[in-house]
Amino acid sequence: MDGSSEKTTNKLVSILPNYRIGKTLGHGSFAKVKLALHVATGHKVAIKILNRSKIKNMGIEIKVQREIKILRFLMHPHIIRQYEVIETPNDIYVVMEYVKSGELFDYIVEKGKLQEDEARHLFQQIISGVEYCHRNMIVHRDLKPENVLLDSQCNIKIVDFGLSNVMHDGHFLKTSCGSPNYAAPEVISGKPYGPDVDIWSCGVILYALLCGTLPFDDENIPNVFEKIKRGMYTLPNHLSHFARDLIPRMLMVDPTMRISITEIRQHPWFNNHLPLYLSIPPLDTIDQAKKIEEEIIQNVVNIGFDRNHVVDSLANRIQNEATVAYHLILDNRNQNSVPNDPFQSKFKEISDGIFNSTLPVQNITSHVGHSFSALYGLKSNVKDDKTWTLGLQSQGSPYDIMTEIFKALQNLKICWKKIGLYNIKCRWVRSFAYYKNHTIEDECAIILPTVIKFEIQLYKVREGKYLLDILRIDGPQFIFFDLCVAFLRELGVL
């Protein structure tokens, strides 16, 4: 080992004492990825080392920070896992799940077109991951085989959330980004767009899986754009009847006519041989964070951590050595428990009572008898309803709805200011005996001086039907979600 290499190794050891650094897995213009072993658990991880000065010079600071923030929020078996982020003045160290195999792109290049059963297996996992993102109001915006990895068991891991963005209900994205061959018509046309762009990209990926080629391809990029905007492509004769039905519905130029994820889940081609764990949507992120497994806690205690410290850290979503160990042990157990059906054991136990996006949205009655639909990031099954809604729908009168809202805010000690006829700004300080009185588990919170600011707007969707929208303005996102849960309970929705 020369002097420079020894110096680099010593630097990594001092910054990352909990990891044994191994070989370089890859490198790029502003980062390199190292294989490492988490010493306490013995599990392998990948550590992405990002150079701050190079990131700044390339003008991608926002992209990098966006990906870090989004991946911290996501927990899904088919989305790459981020365990911790360690920052120094010169570098950012992102500890991530280690995926052994490679890109889906290379797999397609090597094998050519796949048999429909194999393509379906991969596509089902991709849709599950994308659905989870959309449920959490995240649009990937750059889905392509290069951004989909395969693990050692040929299971999907969606990566590269640098171009992703967080959607707010009632708002559309306008930034034109993503890879030309996979970009939706509304993106390349510069029109406002929503999560339907990911459906289009998934359609292109499905075409590539089944055909071994891209539907929209040309040496000349303007020609590619023209084909995309006109929806010009050819379906090979070898495709089955149901595959020939599904692909055109995903590659619909008009996004309002494009098939939704709910409809994809109901499609005969998708449903064929659908694994149990994929037939049940995973817990929402807020519920996942609250779910603490005793068996894993004990494993973490066995390697030297204090039990109360582990539980408190998990309950308050604190990143530290204990929580990193917990999630590494949990994820590796889930991946290895059922080799041919990853995470089945985890999802099987929550199958009863879970809100399934493939089922009709259930009506729930509030205290005053108004009927609300819990639409947390899910599309309705109503055929003519093509909007992406986050909120509560009601058929009550606006006056009655606002009266119930004011009662709920008062009970939760939330201050508000009226800024429009059916529009209010709210402010809540976490300093009251909130968790104890409003059924959120006591262990999930330590009272801290946290301020949450949000806006409530009542929209008229159609005659006699109204949508209540809640938009976070400022404050920690997870705590805001907790507050929303308490608010919904006050309204009688949960």
From Swiss-Prot:
Region (Auto-inhibitory domain (AID)): 289-386
Keyword Ligase assigned: no
Record keyword Ion transport present: no
Modified sites of kind Phosphothreonine: 175
Region (Regulatory domain (RD)) location: 293-494
Binding locations of ATP: 25-33, 48
GO function term, MF aspect, one: protein serine kinase activity
UniProtKB keywords: ATP-binding, Kinase, Nucleotide-binding, Phosphoprotein, Serine/threonine-protein kinase, Transferase
Tissue specificity statement from the Swiss-Prot or TrEMBL entry: Expressed at very low levels.
Entry comment, domain topic: The regulatory domain (RD) contains the auto-inhibitory domain (AID) that inhibits kinase activity of the protein kinase domain (KD). The PPI motif mediates the interaction with the ABI (abscisic acid-insensitive) phosphatases.
Similarity field: Belongs to the protein kinase superfamily. CAMK Ser/Thr protein kinase family. SNF1 subfamily.
Name of this chain's protein: SNF1-related protein kinase catalytic subunit alpha KIN12
